[in-house]
Amino acid sequence: MSSQIDSSSVHQDEVAKANQRFYDQIAKIYNKVDRRRGDHIDHSWVDRVINNMLSTLESTKVGTGELSFMDAASGSGFLAQRARIFFPRITLLDISRNMLKEIDLPRALKVCSDACFIPAKESSFDVIGGIATLHHLKSPKKFFQESYRILRPGGIIYTDHDIESQFVNNFRPILWFYRKLFDHGKNYLNHCPESSEKDYLLSEYHGKEGLSGPKLAEQLSEIGFQIREVVY
């Protein structure tokens, strides 16, 4: 697959629209092509992460209302499916309306919107989580700013499964070979010919070179978050 896009000249809105178009087109085949989050794999690690969040919330939560969780850029709804066991209020946020339609999660609120412009009031959520979210955004910092705005005092933002730039630099030859064998982009395009390779590449904005963990942590701190843990 070609990867010749001058991403430096791409506007944030172009990246958002590419995500919207591409995932609207492949929504029906998404889970068939990318089976990494299927029930055939043990995902109990997510429950441990959520339990750690709950322990943190117990010591910081203000008020007695029902705990609320937002799955930001929810995709297949993988994170929300695990979180619903622990959180009475679940919100799914995704820029693709068709992806949201594919998620079977009764009583969850579905919101079709850009994760960098979240239509929610201040102090609305206890936890905002994103699995493989940040690399789809041209500016993860804008998502962090929105998250800070809508999280309640003592709330938590959790992100995971975005490739780190130092990892890419350290293992570039091995990663190149792995991607040759297991690149989901080719499979998406083969299963959905009407989808666009350009949209796919734009949607994976930071997917090729990764994101800097220290830089993301610095941005979070500048916004006002306290960093509990950085693992990569």
Residue positions per predicted region:
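Conserved class I S-adenosyl-L-methionine
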Residues: 2-63, 99, 156-188
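Class I SAM-dependent methyltransferase SAM/SAH-binding core
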Residues: 70-117
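A conserved beta-strand element that flanks and buttresses the S-adenosyl-L-methionine
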Residues: 129
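Short catalytic micro-motifs in class I SAM-dependent methyltransferases
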Residues: 132-133
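A short glycine-rich, Lys/Arg-flanked "PGG" loop and its adjoining helix->strand segment in the class I
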Residues: 141-153
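Acceptor-substrate binding/catalytic loop of class I
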Residues: 199-215
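Conserved S-adenosyl-L-methionine
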Residues: 225-232
